[in-house]
Amino acid sequence: MKIVIADDHAVVRTGFSMILNYQEDMEVVATAADGVEAYQKVLEHRPDVLILDLSMPPGESGLIATSKISESFPETKILILTMFDDEEYLFHMLKSGAKGYILKNSPDEQLILAVRTVYQGETYVDMKLTTSLVNEFVNQSQTDEVSSSSDPFKILSKRELEILPLIAKGYGNKDIAEKLFVSVKTVEAHKTHIMTKLNLKSKPELVEYALKKKLLEF
């Protein structure tokens, strides 16, 4: 089984590589420090499993990487590394193509089990995250039912269309303001207008929307 590990912390990449390489049926063929590099390593090695950190640097979101990689390389099973403060992303990651989730502080045995589970084509979700996943599924179902059939994308202003992909990529208000030569308050106002116009309730919904509109590219 060929594995690629993508995490922006070298200690995580090294530690997980040691654990998995110790297994007779597993080989870590490459590691990556961000979503862009993860895509390149998957393209190069065509691994059976990609272990991907959800919390990537701005511009290289784990959610974006999951969507791009699962679309281009459906044969590679994606296992997401996450923390409790990432719970709002769980449902959206599954929709984007992830096959499972595991907490970064999980025991070695659980990591190995998770890798083998997704490799076999099954879904693995840490029991500690299951409740959050179910709640998010219910909330998303309700949102889908009440959403309008018309697409509000066309009513976004030119500036809002510039800001939307930057927010989705994980850039903060200050970073966006500097990129576009506007004030932080202006960015905050546009962000509020975008969420209102598109009827979006959370950051994961905004990222998913941007992906659907093909506004995000590596």
UniProtKB/Swiss-Prot annotation:
Signal peptide region: none
What does the entry report about post-translational modification of this chain? Phosphorylated by NreB.
Question: Where is this protein localized, as stated in its record?
Answer: Cytoplasm
* Main localization (coarse): cytoplasm
Top-rank taxon of the source lineage equals Bacteria
GO biological process, alphabetically ordered: phosphorelay signal transduction system; regulation of DNA-templated transcription
Pfam families of this UniProt entry? GerE, Response_reg
- The residues covered by the Response regulatory domain are 2-119
Q: Which GO terms describe its cellular component?
A: cytoplasm
Domain HTH luxR-type residues, every copy: 149-214
Q: Which UniProt keywords apply?
A: Activator, Cytoplasm, DNA-binding, Phosphoprotein, Transcription, Transcription regulation, Two-component regulatory system
Which residues in this protein are found as 4-aspartylphosphate?
A: D53
Q: Name one GO molecular function term.
A: DNA binding
UniProt-listed InterPro entries: CheY-like_superfamily, Sig_transdc_resp-reg_C-effctor, Sig_transdc_resp-reg_receiver, Tscrpt_reg_LuxR_C, WalR-like
PROSITE patterns documented for this protein? HTH_LUXR_1, HTH_LUXR_2, RESPONSE_REGULATORY
- The entry's DNA-binding region feature spans 173-192
Annotated function:
Member of the two-component regulatory system NreB/NreC involved in the control of dissimilatory nitrate/nitrite reduction in response to oxygen. Phosphorylated NreC binds to a GC-rich palindromic sequence at the promoters of the nitrate (narGHJI) and nitrite (nir) reductase operons, as well as the putative nitrate transporter gene narT, and activates their expression.
Question: What name does UniProt use for this protein?
Answer: Oxygen regulatory protein NreC
Q: What is the lineage of its organism?
A: Bacteria, Bacillati, Bacillota, Bacilli, Bacillales
Q: Which gene encodes it?
A: nreC
